[in-house]
UniProtKB/Swiss-Prot annotation:
This is Membrane-associated protein VP24. It is found in: Virion membrane; Host cell membrane; Host endomembrane system. It comes from Sudan ebolavirus (strain Human/Uganda/Gulu/2000). GO terms for molecular function: structural molecule activity. Belongs to the filoviridae membrane-associated protein VP24 family. It is a peripheral membrane protein. The gene is VP24.
Length: 251
């Protein structure tokens, strides 16, 4: 008599690839409060987010600052002198950076459906909402996204963070200090500063920079300590740190 057995049961992908990414990891942005800020988990990556620099942004915005900071306010008038600009939380800044990392790989690689469509939806969710969960309704997307593809997505996010780490602090020498990503719906600008990354999201035409009639813009600051543990390149010497520092910047 034949007997049913489980001799050749496959090991589930999640158990086999503990360091891999499953689709639900991309659709869950988990935030846990800590003593100094928040711990964020997304796509198998963990970030420690703090509030450093946010009070300073607000003071620059309301013109409550030391005279030595005037240059910083004048350098970013569309942020600090614009009635339509809004200071956001560092959690928002992290979401924008992660969304920018997704959009960056969509532009760099010729991704086919359903992957490109799914990534666009996830990027929009990170950029336009503050919710912790995104419900991807299309089962076809879930079925066709392999563990390998999902792990590559995470690798490309880390590559984007590495790009940010190679930026120079805003300087007088014309060295690259910002990355910009444009879509039909918004323009993202991420700028390296002394404290970390100044993140801004504008209208696609960058109307916030119109001197006469500045348009709306949201901005925030993500302290550099948030991305350092994830980035691959590490500072090699104190010399590189001195070269990066710009004492003229308040942030």
């Amino acid at each position: 008599m034949a007997k049913a057995t489980g001799r050749y049961n496959l090991v589930t992908p999640k158990r086999e690839l503990e360091q891999g990414v499953v689709f639900s990891d991309l659709c869950n942005f988990l935030v846990t409060p800590t003593v100094q800020g928040w711990k964020v988990y997304w796509a198998g990556l963990e970030f420690d987010v703090n509030q450093k620099g946010i009070t300073l942004l607000n003071r620059l915005k309301v013109n409550d600052f030391a005279p030595a900071w005037a240059m910083t306010r004048n350098l970013f008038p569309h942020l600090f002198k614009n009635q339509q600009s809004e200071v956001q939380t560092p959690i928002w800044a992290l979401r924008v950076i992660l969304a920018a990392g997704i959009l960056d790989q969509l532009m760099d690689h010729s991704l086919i459906e359903p992957l490109s469509g799914a990534l666009n939806l996830i990027a929009d969710w990170l950029l336009t909402t503050s919710t912790n969960h995104f419900n991807m309704r299309t089962q076809r997307v879930k079925d066709q996204l392999s563990m390998r593809m999902l792990s590559l997505i995470r690798s490309n996010i880390i590559n984007f963070i590495n790009k940010l780490e190679t930026l120079h602090v805003v300087n007088y020498k014309g060295l690259l200090s910002s990355v910009e990503i444009g879509t039909p719906s918004y323009a993202i600008i991420i700028t390296r500063t002394n404290m970390g990354y100044l993140v801004e999201v504008q209208e696609p035409d960058k109307s916030a920079m119109d001197i006469r009639h500045p348009g709306p813009v949201k901005f925030s600051l993500l302290h550099e300590s948030t991305l350092k543990p994830v980035a691959t390149p590490k500072p090699s010497s104190i010399t590189s740190l001195i070269m990066e520092f710009n004492s003229s910047l308040a942030i």
